[in-house]
Amino acid sequence: MAVMAHTNGDYGVQAAVAAGVDSLEHGNYMNEESLAMLAESDTVWVPTLVTVRNLLGDGRYDDETLKPIIESAEENIRKAFRMGIKVAPGSDAGAYRVLHGKGIQDEVQSFVEILGDQDAAYRWLAEGEAEIKKKFTVTVHW
């Protein structure tokens, strides 16, 4: 059975990766040690970037509060790409300002913007998505 963990911060991320989770959702506020653990693991990271990015200009939160969170997440995406961390797209659809359908489009576009290379972003996300599908596919024998 595959296991998915929803966590943020180094303690939660490191505990989840050490436990061998198959998929790590969110993973905000990671340091170098957390990223290194992910790089050495079989865990696929699903960052859900749009949950914060889509709040910019909305007025619900001050943009100056959101920008450092977004910048940190973007830097970790670039580091994860360079480190070969397995990453898959996921939008946290249904969260505030993350519409079903459009949320995943926004998420993929975020990766393209952050990496500055559409083909590289698509390949990286496709590889991670394939890994997620493999891990979470259940074969039922009747």
Which residues are covered by each model-predicted region?
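Short, glycine/charged-enriched secondary-structure capping and boundary segments
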Residues: 18-20, 38-39, 59-61, 102-105
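Short Asp/Glu-rich motifs
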Residues: 14-16, 35, 56-58, 99-100, ...
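Active-site gating loops and adjacent loop-to-helix segments of metal-dependent hydrolytic enzymes
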Residues: 41-68, 108
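Histidine/acidic residue-rich metal-binding segments in metalloenzymes
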Residues: 1-45, 67-87, 120
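His/Asp/Glu-enriched, well-ordered alpha-helical/loop segment
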Residues: 2, 61, 71-142
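Active-site beta-loop-alpha junctions enriched in small/polar residues
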Residues: 8-10, 29, 49-52, 94-96
